[in-house]
């Protein structure tokens, strides 16, 4: 089968920006190895110089979008028209069109094509609008969390139909043995008293840069005899993938403001082949931001390569609570993050090996590729009906989580006290009747407040 993979985000031959682009490379290479003719069309940047291969898959940087998020299509009319022509030619060549991390607004250029898309975030406007406004025959998502967020949003918005939404977990390679620790070029070798913390993320605020620095500073205060080192990758200067990413000068200013000058060390952006040794070089990996992850590769990759991770209980990170070697903490609570780092750093090797075994069985790269092939190559089903339930029940929105007597909202990064509502939701399996005649005055007030904030949404049915 000829498969045209389309990526609005640029792809580069020597490095990968973000987990989504890594998944694209793994999936397309896997499909090619299974005998399919796969080619990728992506956005061109000044760094590109013609076609190239990624793991044997041809890449054509021919789309003339902006190359950074958000507002990917904010280019000239001529650039949009030429991008439409490129999309049309790719669709005419292909048996199936795969829109990776769908953000293709120019759907008229794909008219008549059988479209399978994937969604890998539900934060940027491109992903949100794609699921509400742009047609596809099937949508692939990496987690039940994202599936439920999309379905709830579509139902709540008043749409009457929805395509099949299929969960295919991202695949993570687990080495047979823990890799040899390898620090990046320019970083001093590990010292005897070092406690190395890793922050292998794009340097944007919601990824937890501020929280990571604050946590590292607190760890150093508690462990004055240790030499705490927080390693942070500097964004590639020619990538321009995310407008929210800070420059090195801006990052250094933040480090100084938070008292981390003697703790933080910046290094160059690493290629996928360098990541295993990098993870293995750390004592703990930090994933403690407010970014609403739709899967979150970093903590799983970290444990796979022998290093425990501390994760904020945000978005799809919550699905990793039972993976040994991953410690969940409430977002924004630096004291909890600090204690979790100290606990993780003192954890046993057996715990990490148990986590590695869990990852092998749950997040296999082979299963991921087989799942994508099954969805992309099979006979496509028709859209399903979706509507609000007739009984007027409210349910806890999938982007919210009960944490103690509080409810955390992923999209506002806030935690509010709802003691009566929390008790009712626990008893009624996440549902509540909004009838003031059936509720106490205090519960009714909490229900009304939560409904207004989008914490409670109408129950929906998919036919």
Segments from the language model and where they lie:
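Short alpha-helical donor nucleotide-sugar binding micro-motif in glycosyltransferases
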Residues: 269, 278-282
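Nucleotide-activated donor-binding/catalytic signature segment of Leloir-type glycosyltransferases, i.e.
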Residues: 244-269
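A charged, aromatic-enriched C-terminal amphipathic alpha-helix characteristic of glycosyltransferases
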Residues: 346-377, 381-384
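Short hydrophobic beta-strand element within catalytic cores of glycosyltransferases
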Residues: 308-311
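Conserved donor-binding/catalytic core segment of Leloir-type glycosyltransferases
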Residues: 140, 189-207, 213-218, 231
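Conserved acidic donor-binding segment of nucleotide-sugar-dependent glycosyltransferases
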Residues: 323-335, 342-348
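A short, active-site helix/loop in glycosyltransferases that binds the activated sugar's phosphate group
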Residues: 126-128, 136-167, 172-174
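N-terminal strand-loop element at the rim of the active site
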Residues: 7-14, 30-71
């Amino acid at each position: 089968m000829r498969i045209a993979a389309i990526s609005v985000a640029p792809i580069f031959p020597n490095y990968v920006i973000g987990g989504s682009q890594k998944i694209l490379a793994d999936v397309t290479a896997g499909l090619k190895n299974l005998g399919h003719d796969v080619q990728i069309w992506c956005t061109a940047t000044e760094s590109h110089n013609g076609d190239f291969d990624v793991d044997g898959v041809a890449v054509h940087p021919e789309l003339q979008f902006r190359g950074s998020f958000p507002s990917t299509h904010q280019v000239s009319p001529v650039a949009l028209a030429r991008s439409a022509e490129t999309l049309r030619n790719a669709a005419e060549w292909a048996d199936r069109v795969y829109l990776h991390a769908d953000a293709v607004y120019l759907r008229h250029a794909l008219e008549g094509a059988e479209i399978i898309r994937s969604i890998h975030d539900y934060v940027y406007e491109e992903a949100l609008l794609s699921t509400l406004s742009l047609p596809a025959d099937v949508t692939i998502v990496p987690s039940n969390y994202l599936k439920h967020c999309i379905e709830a949003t579509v139902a709540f918005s008043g749409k009457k139909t929805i395509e099949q939404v299929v969960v295919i977990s991202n695949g993570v390679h687990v080495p047979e043995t823990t890799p040899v620790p390898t620090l990046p070029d320019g970083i001093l070798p590990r010292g005897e008293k070092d406690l190395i913390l890793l922050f292998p993320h794009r340097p944007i605020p919601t990824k937890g840069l501020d929280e990571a620095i604050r946590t590292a500073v607190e760890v150093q205060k508690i462990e004055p005899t240790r030499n705490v080192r927080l390693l942070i990758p500097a964004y590639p200067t020619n990538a321009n993938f995310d407008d929210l990413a800070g420059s090195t000068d801006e990052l250094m200013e933040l480090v100084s403001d938070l008292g981390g000058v003697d703790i933080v060390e910046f290094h160059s952006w690493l290629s996928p082949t360098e990541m295993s040794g990098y993870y293995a070089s750390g004592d703990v990996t930090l994933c403690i931001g407010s970014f609403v992850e739709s899967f979150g590769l970093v903590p799983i990759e970290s444990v796979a390569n022998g290093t425990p991770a501390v994760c904020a209980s945000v978005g799809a990170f919550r699905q990793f609570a039972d993976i040994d070697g991953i410690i969940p903490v409430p977002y924004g609570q630096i004291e909890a993050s600090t204690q979790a780092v100290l606990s993780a750093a003192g954890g046993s090797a057996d715990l990490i090996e148990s986590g590695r075994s869990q990852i092998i069985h749950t997040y296999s790269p082979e299963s991921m590729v087989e799942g994508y092939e099954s969805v992309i190559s099979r006979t496509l089903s028709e859209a399903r009906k979706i509507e609000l339930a007739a009984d007027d029940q409210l349910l806890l929105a999938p982007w919210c989580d009960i944490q103690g007597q509080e409810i955390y909202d992923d999209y506002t990064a806030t935690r509010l006290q709802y003691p009566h509502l929390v008790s009712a939701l626990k008893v009624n399996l996440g549902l509540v009747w909004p009838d003031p005649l059936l509720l106490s005055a205090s519960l009714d007030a909490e229900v009304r407040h939560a409904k207004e904030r989008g914490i409670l949404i109408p129950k929906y049915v998919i036919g």
